[in-house]
Amino acid sequence: MKAIIVLLMVVTSNADRICTGITSSNSPHVVKTATQGEVNVTGVIPLTTTPTKSHFANLKGTKTRGKLCPNCLNCTDLDVALARPMCIGTIPSAKASILHEVRPVTSGCFPIMHDRTKIRQLPNLLRGYENIRLSTHNVINAERAPGGPYRLGTSGSCPNVTSRSGFFATMAWAVPRDNKTATNPLTVEVPYICTKGEDQITVWGFHSDSKTQMKKLYGDSNPQKFTSSANGVTTHYVSQIGGFPNQTEDGGLPQSGRIVVDYMVQKPGKTGTIVYQRGVLLPQKVWCASGRSKVIKGSLPLIGEADCLHEKYGGLNKSKPYYTGEHAKAIGNCPIWVKTPLKLANGTKYRPPAKLLKER
């Protein structure tokens, strides 16, 4: 393969004799120069390498995050992001994060209609922050929210440490206690409660079911309307009544209904609003997140350390300044991608052996 010359050294002599020339043999090194085209030289130093695929690793000198919550056993990153019971734990701070769930599976609490919202992006949104923590307090009093009083619904698929049924800590399933009637759109303000100037990620949603179940739970079997607004972003939804698609990825959860889950990002001091009818999942604990973590697609487990993390090759140690092969996103102390190999000429321009001449 042709290479581009980086440096070419030329040696001259001011001797008063014509000698036999440069002692050399056939040179296998051909470099391509800007002024002389292809040139044979007596020696080169390769500047490029072609990596092979390897395990992903921890980035040297930097905290690297794989799973959002390494100590939350049998929990997907979506479980952690929604704060499913038994999946609440400390998320370690990190300057680099591995996006290892290309299509995050649903949580085991309740069948989620993923395609209606951007909820699959929530774990990746959190992964992009260096510091992430779940608030200790609820953002609103769900039981006394407009349209209440409410009892908080639970799911037998969500047992917690104290009960055989529960629900996500980020949301409250608002089921009317007594006033099971249709309602006009109601509005609740969502205050900013993070304390360190972080972004506040507020999770909310709504539940829908068959006409029979909607009438039983909420007193209204018609489609319900919902709107969220924060940081200049407004989102509208209308609930679907029955006719839900089969979601085999839910692992055979028994519920007949579905929930739609979304989130909004609130900047420091900014209030959000949710306009809702029956079946709302009101926000409770919120995520407080700050700093930036570089995110790269990869896989787990993380084995050892590496200078560079590359989406196609995994963990790389930088042995040369350039590399050839597949070009993809990389983070860390990485070699630079080039299309063709580069070589540094560390010898002279090759000349064939000169014939022996007489002295003058």
Swiss-Prot record:
Cystine connections: none
Glycosylation sites: N40, N74, N160, N179, N246, N317, N346
Family classification: Belongs to the influenza viruses hemagglutinin family.
Entry function: Binds to sialic acid-containing receptors on the cell surface, bringing about the attachment of the virus particle to the cell. Plays a major role in the determination of host range restriction and virulence. Class I viral fusion protein. Responsible for penetration of the virus into the cell cytoplasm by mediating the fusion of the membrane of the endocytosed virus particle with the endosomal membrane. Low pH in endosomes induce an irreversible conformational change in HA2, releasing the fusion hydrophobic peptide. Several trimers are required to form a competent fusion pore.
Gene3D superfamilies named among the record's database cross-references: 3.90.209.20, Hemagglutinin Chain A, Domain 2
UniProt keyword Lipoprotein, yes or no: yes
Record's subcellular location: Virion membrane; Host apical cell membrane
SUPFAM superfamilies: Viral protein domain
Other facts: Major glycoprotein, comprises over 80% of the envelope proteins present in virus particle.
Primary localization: virion
Protein keywords: Disulfide bond, Fusion of virus membrane with host endosomal membrane, Fusion of virus membrane with host membrane, Glycoprotein, Hemagglutinin, Host cell membrane, Host membrane, Host-virus interaction, Lipoprotein, Membrane, Palmitate, Signal, Transmembrane, Viral attachment to host cell, Viral envelope protein, Viral penetration into host cytoplasm, Virion, Virus entry into host cell
Record has DNA damage as a keyword: no
Membrane-topology descriptor: Single-pass type I membrane protein
GO annotation terms (biological process): fusion of virus membrane with host endosome membrane; fusion of virus membrane with host plasma membrane; symbiont entry into host cell; virion attachment to host cell
UniProt signal peptide: 1-15
Subunit structure: Homotrimer of disulfide-linked HA1-HA2.
Entries under InterPro entries matching the protein: Capsid_hemagglutn, Hemagglutn_HA1_a/b_dom_sf, Hemagglutn_influenz_A/B
One annotated GO molecular function: host cell surface receptor binding
Gene that this sequence comes from: HA
Protein name as it appears in the record: Hemagglutinin
Organism of this sequence: Influenza B virus (strain B/South Dakota/5/1989)
GO cellular component entries: host cell plasma membrane; membrane; viral envelope; virion membrane
